[in-house]
């Protein structure tokens, strides 16, 4: 969006900025409608409605690198007014849970406003990481221009890679997802340039036009790209009927099941927004359609895990605007699905079986001695873990240890011939350090984690953080 805004004529650029501001307002309206509450009573036991946000918005036109980056910061005051006139603090529990749903609301609203104003169409980027959620870009905007104006992100990613490499050298393992987040934050700060001298919008647009001409091969190519983006080929929007809603609700549920075992309304609402964008709908009833999909998924396709409310009916002063009790937390109900419960039952049944393949105890002891000779001595607990998992015959075993506890190393001394004879297959929930050396010790090629690139023919159920699953 920022690339097109930077090089389009002033009239079009103004409409793009208006669409952005309208999408920001839609996201704030979502927060006010669904996620903004305060707390009253002893220990804040009552969650109550408030009149709205008090906030200041600041729109920036570029990044620290000087690239076009139209974005708005919204500084929110922590005080809100309750319906009885008191000024109290925001209940951050719900606001935190709703962050991603608010972000997806902005994304959907932006596409909708740009299509209504300028006929702009979005599509999924073809070079995106298949392990991540798809990124949508404006049809007709040259990817080379987007890459040229992503200098800030490129510098962060480069530094993050360097920090991750250094982390692995220092700790003998790759960083966990949480640690990668901290490394990304560190990279963001370390690569943050000093603020450049202020430039007027006219000066910025002249500079951006020159840069775009260099990337695309001349000013005529820039004009042609803008024309293509503003006049995309038309696609037929699906007919919104009961069949479409049912199919979309099924897709929402499938996406939820692929990423989590339980969910709340915020997860459903965020995924519903993604499905509506992917369908390229032109309806002006997006909000109503999102609500309909959320209701379909939660009421007809999900199984509630939260115990039902008691039969006590509070008086009106103790109920929120939607009729719910002030003694409940909005959006806190947990749900799952039949498929998740069936998978859980299969795991439990498998965990009760002890007829799996085993390795001879003598072979396990010899492998441990071989590990000592090769400089990989294990302590008593680690050695016991290897013996137990190799010889127990249990169909499903779980090793729980702190992240970075070198769980994969415990399996490294497993006897080569024993594993080969037993036909065992090791599966790591996360990419282990030095996978090839472990595989060589086991006498077989390395397998792949579901979170790592590479071929894989099996799926591993979600495991607790800091755990390694072994199925026989």
Locations of the language-model features?
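Helicase P-loop NTPase motor core of nucleic-acid translocases
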Residues: 1-472
């Amino acid at each position: 969006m920022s690339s097109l805004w930077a090089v389009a004529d002033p009239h079009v650029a103004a409409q793009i900025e208006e669409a952005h501001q309208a999408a920001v307002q839609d996201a704030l309206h979502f927060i006010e409608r669904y996620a903004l509450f305060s707390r009253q009573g002893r220990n804040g036991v009552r969650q109550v409605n408030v009149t709205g946000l008090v906030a200041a918005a600041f729109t920036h036109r570029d990044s620290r690198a000087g690239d076009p980056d139209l974005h708005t910061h919204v500084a929110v005051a922590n005080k809100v007014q309750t319906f009885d006139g008191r000024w109290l603090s925001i209940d951050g529990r719900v606001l935190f849970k709703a962050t991603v749903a608010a972000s997806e609301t902005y994304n959907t609203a932006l596409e909708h406003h740009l299509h209504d104003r300028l006929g702009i169409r979005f599509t999924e980027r073809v070079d995106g990481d298949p392990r991540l959620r798809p990124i949508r870009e404006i049809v007709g905007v040259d990817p080379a221009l987007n890459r040229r104006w992503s200098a800030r992100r490129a510098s962060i990613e480069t530094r993050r890679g360097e920090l991750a490499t250094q982390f692995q050298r220092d700790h003998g393992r790759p960083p966990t997802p949480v640690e990668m987040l901290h490394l990304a934050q560190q990279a963001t700060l370390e690569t943050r340039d000093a603020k450049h001298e202020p430039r007027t919008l006219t000066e910025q647009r002249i500079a951006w036009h020159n840069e775009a001409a260099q990337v695309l091969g001349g000013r005529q190519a820039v004009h042609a790209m803008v024309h293509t983006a503003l006049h995309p080929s038309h696609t037929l929007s699906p007919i919104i009927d009961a069949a479409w809603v049912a199919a979309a609700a099924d897709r929402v549920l499938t996406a939820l099941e692929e990423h989590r075992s339980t969910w709340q309304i915020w997860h459903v609402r965020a995924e519903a927004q993604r499905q509506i964008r992917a369908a390229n709908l032109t309806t002006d009833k997006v909000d109503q359609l999102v609500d309909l999909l959320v209701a379909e998924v939660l009421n007809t396709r999900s199984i509630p895990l939260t115990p039902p409310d008691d039969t006590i009916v509070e008086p009106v002063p103790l109920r929120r605007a939607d009729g719910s009790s002030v003694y409940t937390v909005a959006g806190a109900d947990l749900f799952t699905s039949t498929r998740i419960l069936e998978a859980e039952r299969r795991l439990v049944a498998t965990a009760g079986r002890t007829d799996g393949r085993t390795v001879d105890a003598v072979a396990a002891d010899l492998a441990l001695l071989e590990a000592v000779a090769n400089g990989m001595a294990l302590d008593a607990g680690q050695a016991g873990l290897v013996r137990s998992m190799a010889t127990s015959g249990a169909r499903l075993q779980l090793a729980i240890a702190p992240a970075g506890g070198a769980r994969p190393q415990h399996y490294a001394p497993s006897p080569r011939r024993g594993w080969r004879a037993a036909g065992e297959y090791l599966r790591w929930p996360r990419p282990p350090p030095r996978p090839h050396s472990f595989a060589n010790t086991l006498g077989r090629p390395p397998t792949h984690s579901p979170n790592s690139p590479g071929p894989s023919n099996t799926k591993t159920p979600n495991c607790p953080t800091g755990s390694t699953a072994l199925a026989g």
